[in-house]
Swiss-Prot record:
The modification N5-methylglutamine is found at Q231. It is found in: Cytoplasm. The keyword Cell inner membrane does not apply. This is Peptide chain release factor 1. Methylated by PrmC. Methylation increases the termination efficiency of RF1. Pfam families: PCRF (PF03462), RF-1 (PF00472). It comes from Sulfurovum sp. (strain NBC37-1). Belongs to the prokaryotic/mitochondrial release factor family. GO terms for molecular function: translation release factor activity, codon specific. The keyword Magnesium does not apply. The gene is prfA. PANTHER family: LD18447P. Keywords: Cytoplasm, Methylation, Protein biosynthesis.
Length: 355
């Protein structure tokens, strides 16, 4: 019975309450913080679980009263209100029972790179960045460009941005992969539709505790930063390239005039990429056959097509087609895509957990 699956969560919540009131725990700040965090994570589930149990018990009691001459009609009326509540509560609880992704509340580095399609691909990087920026604005998040490499005809060959706010990774983690665009470029005189692509990486930001990179594991090169077309824009060696020797991961930052600032930015990105690389290994070892493997690593996997002539957006992983491309791109109404992706991921997780 579903009720029986709920009891361990309620028991653990009550156990934490007892532990938090014990003098031993009160004197151990780290343990107290850890337990408080666990309890606050369980609270929404326990609240729904108690409501589910109360509702199920009330249904059982009213069913027993159906044959009663005096109370039968009242019991029937109560049941008509209570019975539809149970399946709805069960679905809500199942979502809360899904093991939480420890990275969901983290800020991210968003990395966009031009792929096949030359100049048109670089222009699309700028368009997609604007789409994410507008969505971030709606969500109350803060966007800061970390590094850019300009395209020869506008746009960006590469753009790295930091996005900070509540639940950023939980909303954007399914964006990683290849995004394909089909449209008529401004330079096209015959009106032919061209296809180009960009890759998107969504990397959770990490702190020093999560990733420990030793100084002797990093090789640093400095060079003069260059602008569009390769001309030098700085007379000092302010650009920084960091190489993580154990993994071969390379990060180059040249946006700041100060070498020190570029190094700090590069180190932050490097730590996040090393963390993501470790995360990817774990995912490869443990992930099932889910369509929505987060950051499935294969950046070549085509996840979405943006067809401008038809105003159509298609997400190939879940078979979602929307004829609202202008709304998504110009207004940042990415919820139209993100909400179905999250719902699909939750359904897969519920099935995988056997709930």
């Amino acid at each position: 019975m579903f009720k029986e699956k709920l009891q361990p969560f309620i028991d653990r919540y009550n156990e934490i309450s007892e532990l938090l009131s014990s003098p031993d725990i009160a004197s151990d700040i780290n343990r107290m913080t850890e337990l408080s965090k666990e309890q606050s994570g369980l609270a929404p589930l326990v609240e729904k679980a108690n409501l589910y149990i109360e509702t199920a018990d009330a249904i059982a009691e009213n069913k027993e009263l159906l044959s009663d001459e005096e109370l039968g009609d009242l019991a029937k009326e109560e049941l008509s209100e209570l019975e539809p509540m149970l399946p709805k509560l069960e679905e809500e609880i199942k979502i809360l029972m899904i093991p939480k992704d420890k990275n969901d509340d983290k800020n991210i580095f968003l990395e966009l790179r031009a792929g096949a399609g030359g100049d048109e691909s670089a222009l699309f990087v700028a368009d997609v960045f604007r789409m994410y920026s507008r969505y971030a604005e709606q969500m109350g998040w803060k966007v800061e460009i970390v590094s850019t490499n300009d395209g020869t005809a506008g746009g960006y060959k590469e753009l790295i941005a930091e996005i900070k706010g509540q639940g950023v990774y939980s909303q954007l983690k399914y964006e990683a992969g290849t995004h394909r665009v089909q449209r008529v470029p401004d330079t096209e005189t015959q009106g032919r539709v061209h296809t180009s692509a960009i890759t998107v990486a969504v990397i959770p930001e990490v702190d020093d505790v999560e990733v420990d990179i030793k100084p002797n594991e990093v090789k640093m090169d400095v060079y003069r930063s260059s602008g569009c077309g390769g001309q030098s824009v700085n007379t000092t060696d302010s650009a920084v390239r960091l190489t993580h020797i154990p993994t071969g991961i390379v990060v180059a930052i040249q946006d700041e005039k100060s070498q020190h600032k570029n190094r700090d930015k590069a180190m932050k990105v490097l730590k996040a990429r090393v963390y993501e690389s470790e995360l990817q290994k774990q995912l490869d070892e443990t992930a099932g056959q889910r369509k929505l493997q987060v950051g499935s690593g294969d950046r070549s996997e085509k996840i979405r097509t943006y067809n401008y002539p038809q105003n159509r957006l298609t997400d190939h992983r879940i078979g979602l087609t929307l004829y609202a491309l202008d709304d998504v791109m110009n207004n940042g109404n990415l919820k139209l895509v993100i909400d179905p992706l999250i719902a699909h991921a939750q359904t897969e997780a519920i099935q995988e957990a056997g709930l």
